[in-house]
Amino acid sequence: MSHIPSELKYATSHEWIRVEANGEAVVGITEHAQDLLGDMVFVDLPEVGKQIGAGDDCAVAESVKAASDIYSPVSGEIVAINEELEGSPELVNSDPYGAGWLFRIKLDDAGELANLLDAEGYQNLVDEE
């Protein structure tokens, strides 16, 4: 069973988001998602400065099994990407909620967070799959 941290919010497309005090948020894919994908071989991240909308595909995770689009759970501006993933994409597998984060986004509308799942809601989604 996948670990689902209670302090995060989740998208139905298996991304997590952690909002920080400065109005920015960190986004990654869940442990469940990386389990399904398998060993990461490459992660294509968005450009810093790019504006994206909630639900927009903005990155691609390539594993030994498949390439999968990654969607932004909220709208905003990409302010940073995890450059460590360029040389170590396996961090997404080994530490999906920590060192395997994908990008940081400056939120356009914090109200969009209400559209996301809490840990219990995400667990229910995973259980139904």
Curated annotation (Swiss-Prot):
InterPro entries: 2-oxoA_DH_lipoyl-BS, Biotin_lipoyl, GCV_H, GCV_H/Fam206, GCV_H_sub, Single_hybrid_motif. SUPFAM superfamilies: Single hybrid motif (SSF51230). One of its GO terms (cellular component) is glycine cleavage complex. Residues 24-106 form the Lipoyl-binding domain. CDD domains: GCS_H (cd06848). The modification N6-lipoyllysine is found at K65. Binds 1 lipoyl cofactor covalently. It comes from the Bacteria. One of its GO terms (biological process) is glycine decarboxylation via glycine cleavage system. Keywords: Lipoyl. Its cofactor is (R)-lipoate. PANTHER family: GLYCINE CLEAVAGE SYSTEM H PROTEIN, GLYCINE CLEAVAGE SYSTEM H PROTEIN-RELATED. The glycine cleavage system is composed of four proteins: P, T, L and H. The glycine cleavage system catalyzes the degradation of glycine. The H protein shuttles the methylamine group of glycine from the P protein to the T protein. Belongs to the GcvH family. This is Glycine cleavage system H protein. The lineage of its organism: Bacteria, Pseudomonadati, Pseudomonadota, Gammaproteobacteria, Aeromonadales. The gene is gcvH.
